[in-house]
């Protein structure tokens, strides 16, 4: 049974398929059809809803894609849909009124998703800047209205005062309700399908040993596609959503520690503080809805050759802490990837933490090439950490995604640079060595030639930026409206 708040109503559900998404639950079980399905893969945002949860005694709101969220993730949270925004006197919520006033809807299919993203933004950042608005809406697509009136509507809500609505008035009562259901059972069973929701790392380790064929799910932003896109049945799920000790985000004297269950959006501040380019890339990692659910641990465990974070972690010489039963081990992340979608992870073993060395200088850079600026998969992702002493390369770690069957270091390129003067001529030699490091495939995202040339040009860009630290040109397009 799972227990959660549907707006202000406590719901206890024990007859749901563990494979059911929140979108299907809303539309087929409780007749809340305002939430739409556009793509079923987390790309369009039409299905956006907002989840509220108690964090350190405060109510925190997150926009999420309901098409990628399994119902087990609702336990202990508040689920808010576009229908719930209407005031008790049936008047429009301030967000809804703004969209009407600024003519931000035409066919209306995408409008509920936009409104929920704007609602979450208003709750989290009432004084939102245009950059905040663009980030919040980057995961919502509109094919007929055009974005300017929608952005104008969102900007009209920006104020230095908290958003006052019925949710603000009921906040203390909502927190009490959520706190009252935290310790209730959180497992789901329907026929031969089961979803377990352990609440500690120790409990997770025991469960995974008892069910070694189970699928672990954190945010579910990738695993849910097996259900929504490929119509597969997942017999046993183990959700780590409630494992709070895997949501650590801290720094020691030497390292940054990121829990494998920490949402990407929660890791942003720490990573941006120490590695600005890492933070910049996370802004381009899918959409805010996906970042509010997905985790770096999941991005690593997925072992995709085009995952955005593994090349960066490899270039930074990061390590991962793995747990199996009562035993733990730590390994360099570059050793984790064996071949396409094959890792060094043993049966019943899972990633517990990602450990990133703190920087000793500002030599790290990361670049991503994709067809869209926001919410798109990489054609090539490159990460560089090259250190120069007395005009010569003393240290070099270069890694790419999208260039091989796994995220991989460019060792020939590195060796060409090590000990050599940091010059244009040597950079050109190293660029040529990248063609020996990798033989990328051609697919619908990019050809082999395009990938190879892009990777080489990333190295050249890195060289130019390092040579011209005080005269950098901004190449990022920050707004379309």
PLM region descriptions:
Residues 1-3, 396:
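Extreme N-terminal starter segment of soluble prokaryotic enzymes
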Residues 5-12, 50-53:
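Short strand-turn-strand beta-turns centered on an Asx-Gly dipeptide
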Residues 10-30, 74-94, 112-130:
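Short, charged low-complexity linear segments at domain edges
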Residues 18-49:
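A basic, amphipathic helix-loop patch mediating RNA/tRNA/ribosome contacts
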Residues 39, 44-47, 67, 107-110, ...:
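Disulfide-bonded cysteines in secreted/extracellular proteins and peptides
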Residues 50-54, 63-66, 94-100, 104, ...:
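C-terminal structural segment of proteins
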Residues 51-82:
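S4-like RNA-binding module at protein N-termini
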